[in-house]
Each structure stands twice: as structure tokens, then as C-alpha cells.
């Protein structure tokens, strides 16, 4: 944090798999007190109780425990909160304090971004959707005549065995249990093209709700329970095949 402050950083992100942890909270408070001019994004959390504590010192909160496409936290530990439910719960606390929420994980489509924003998030954090673009790390791999890029989670074996992983998962001097996997994702080309497509999808979603901005989107959007049948109905169906 001191090095970041010295470099002129105006935002410090406290990024931990389990943000609602005594040591993490204590460290975050100390950093915030020491570097008062810098904004702090704190996470990750998934409950209202965690939000109450975080709102006392954080300028923004990151939500998400186990929803990522390459995250196995919920399988390994049995712990986690469905992402949309977590967003709604944290926002119910953070909104009253004027603290914005960032939805981190579980975003598969522009529709998921729209739902996260509708639930009260001010922004989303993307991994899988941007993985596979030219700008992301990872080698391009050819398989079955198609191109892919390597993609690994922050809880994957190779990451947690690195120095950064040991700091994130408190594994100094002991063997860590991976909470993520390494995989391949389709090669997607320039990130600008992906972002443009996602942005258009969000605009369409806001248009259907009649919202001109995020504030109106938060106010006007409504949620309804759906069944597996309605999920099937909401996708292309009753077709012999889809022409790509």
C-alpha cells in the first residue's frame, strides 16, 4: 500500500477471497487510516452483516464468494451465496450508506450484467467474458481446428502456489487446497469488440425497463421468480440447429 501511495495511486483495492475476516478487515482499516486520500475498494463479501462492517471504512464494496466460472470454492468448502442474492443483500445495506457495490463473478452474458446492475450494483467485474481476448495473458492454443486461450482462476493450483496466491489465501508454510481451475476459453479477438457487444446488450436491457441511467434502472427494475421451463422458453428453442 505504501508503494502504491508513493506511485500516486488514487484507489487501493483490498482483494481477498474472504473479505469478512478479522485480519483482512483490520488490515483494511489500517490502510484506510494511513492513506486517507486514496479511495478503497474492499472485498469480497456476500452478506449484509459483512456489508455493515465494510461500509464503515470502504468507499466501494466488491461482492462475490464462489460464483466465478473457474472458481470451485463452493464445491471445496460448501460456502457461498448465489450471486444475485448476495448483490441484493449487500446493496440493501450499502445503498443506505451511499457505498457503491461492484458485482464480481458469475457474469456470463450481457443479460447477467443487466441483472446485476438492476439488483443495485454500480459496476461489474469481469473475468471469463474478457478472457480469450487479445489483451489478456495466456497463450493461444489450437484444438480441433478452433483457437482458444488459457484462463486460470486466482484459486487455481498454479496461482495459490505463487507468492501472490500465498498472500491471498494465507497459505504460508502449509499446503493449500485449490479453489479454482485452469481451463481454455474460445479466442475472442480484440477486447473492444467484446465490450461493445456487452454494452449494447446492457443498453437494450435498460431500454426494455425504460431506464435512461443507472439510477432509474435501480428504481424501475423488478424481479420475478422463474421456473426451469421459463429458462428454456427464454432461449432459442424448437429449432433443428442454429446457423453461426
Give residue spans per PLM region.
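Alpha/beta enzyme core
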Residues: 1-104, 108-149, 168-172
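Generic structural "secondary-structure junction" signal
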Residues: 47, 72, 78-81, 109, ...
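Alpha-helical protein-protein interaction elements
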Residues: 140, 161-162, 195, 200
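Catalytic core of tubulin tyrosine ligase-like
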Residues: 149-172, 181-182, 188-189
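C-terminal extensions of enzymes
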Residues: 170-244
